[in-house]
Swiss-Prot record:
In the N-terminal section; belongs to the carbohydrate kinase PfkB family. PANTHER family: BIFUNCTIONAL PROTEIN HLDE (PTHR46969:SF1). The keyword Kinase applies. The gene is hldE. Residues 1-326 are annotated as: Ribokinase. Residues 354-485 are annotated as: Cytidylyltransferase. GO terms for molecular function: ATP binding; heptose 7-phosphate kinase activity; heptose-1-phosphate adenylyltransferase activity; phosphotransferase activity, alcohol group as acceptor. This is Bifunctional protein HldE.
Amino acid sequence: MDFSSTRVLCIGDVMLDRFMHGSVERISPEAPVPVLRITSTHSMLGGAGNVAHNIADLGGTAILVGLIGHDDTAIALRTHLERVPGIVNALVESPHRPTICKTRFLAAQQQVVRTDDESHLPTQPAEEMLLQTMVATHITECGAVILSDYGKGVLSPAVIKHVIGLARQAGIPVFVDPKRLDFSVYAGATCITPNVKELSAAAHQRADDEASVIAAARIVMQQAEGASILATRSEKGMMLIEAPAEGRDDIAIHTVPARAREVFDVSGAGDTVIATLALAHASGLTLESAMRISNAAAGVVVSKAGTATLNVDELRAELDESAISNGSTGSARSLGEARSLVKKWKQLGLTVGFTNGCFDILHAGHVSLLNEARTRCDRLIVAVNTDASVSRLKGPTRPINGFEDRCTVLAGLRSVDCVVGFQEDTPLSVISVLLPDRLFKGADYREEDVVGGDVVRAAGGKVELIDLVPGRSTTGIVKKISTLT
């Protein structure tokens, strides 16, 4: 999973989130209100800025377009942007409005009050022109566009129409985090990501179970002229109602559950969803696969306090723990099951690695090779010789451990995601079916001699050799045991 070459243009309401932490120990003598004694403060990018921050922390590049004022908040916001190398500052400064700033006052991690410093004036024609020019300058560099609409004025109907028009001309998908009740303003977008409350309000009907979510989505899809709808459903996960495509007359429906966890803060979870969705789709994944990745990403950030982001390592770890990772089950899978896993993993943009062997008596050399292989890929498949295959290769006294035992031990390793058996002397047939992205063997081989290497390379993959741990072998262990008896 590598987003380093993916660029996303993010336009919307950029703001600064400030947090004032303290304690409440008394009531004011001036009025019946608590007195908050401030002990610490911090600030971070908010709104569309948080969307861009999520993209950057996942390894992508965000082109951030929005309006800021000529004030101290703008200076603080620019300072934050300078600290995030993955964000390109394409903000427009306006003398007609303040930089949006939301300040939260907290005691014992509970909000006491929030203040909003913002303008309620509609976007001026001159501001719209500057925003449109900035978008036109950068849009062709990007693989996706995000409209982060917080309803604060930047995304006026004129700006939305202009941006979507430019994107469609360039064949660039557009993702919308909506705030408006009328989704017709987003006509031409690729995917809109309302939560169920926003979806219900836009469709003017309930959206509290799968059937009603689908019905509501059909209504707003007509308003938005065929945009797909990704409905976020809190603890129920997500539902993607995908617009009809070539070869399909009706919508396609995909669901993914949320993994049970302790939720600390849902602030900014929607920003993470749309950032990951757009980034994953721009990198080549289908909308369904991008939804599954964004669902995992949202699961990470809601377990953190405050407006949070995540990095690729955290996302990989969450995929490992979630149902979509489909890790090993403690025994060998059939070739058909392994092929299905590989297909799903590749749809998620994961790099699939492969190695093989007898693994008769698991030793430090085996574990070292498997651990190193797993660091070079996102998922590792280990193909294991059956007992008959081992006997043909090693002699009638082998294997020491039976096939099921060997597979169970391997499947119990954290570095191994799938174990599959093969009856032949080589794993060529397995490799030809699975077509892994990486084929790993010990450095005692030459690349040109690795079985299946030509098949993997022809499919665009690589053969990689891994250094062995000296003096470690099953044969050596067997000989040592024989001297003791």
